[in-house]
Amino acid sequence: MSFDLGNLLQQYAANNPANADQAVNDFDRVAEAAPSAELAQGVSQAFRSDDTPPFPQMLGNLFGNSNSGQQAGMLNQLLGSIGPGVLSSLAGGVLGNMFGGNHNQQAAPQITPEQASQLSPQQVQEIAQQAEQHNPGIVDRMGEFYAQHPQLVKGLGGAALAIALGHMAQGMRRN
């Protein structure tokens, strides 16, 4: 696919909300051509933006649109940022019940796809909220994770995608 990535991204440099409708289509093209690290930074900025829903809500929505393998991957990133001591109280105690209280207290347990599919988007929102409180860097880790799954990111909607593309355009200007 031959196109000028820089010119496409410049359309979003002003974070113009009028670009939101076109952002869904443009995001596909950018996701194919842009370096993964740039895409991750753009997604992270969409997660942090005051113009998008709160980070935990966005993750809950992404979780609900993911397959069980993607859900497990995302949850393992979140849980790894929290630490094992907090796990039993999260998601209404569901996580503690999943592991029967027998998980290694030195490391976060690994969630399987089957276990991930037992959680609701609302429970994931609670986990994401706790993860963000314990480790604000989780927003960047989730940006990196979802940069590997750009089709899921499209589910955030045009406004969030326009923010991600705008941040990527600003990053290209700095480089």
Task: Mark where each language-model region is.
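A structural "flexibility-hinge" signal
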Residues: 1-175
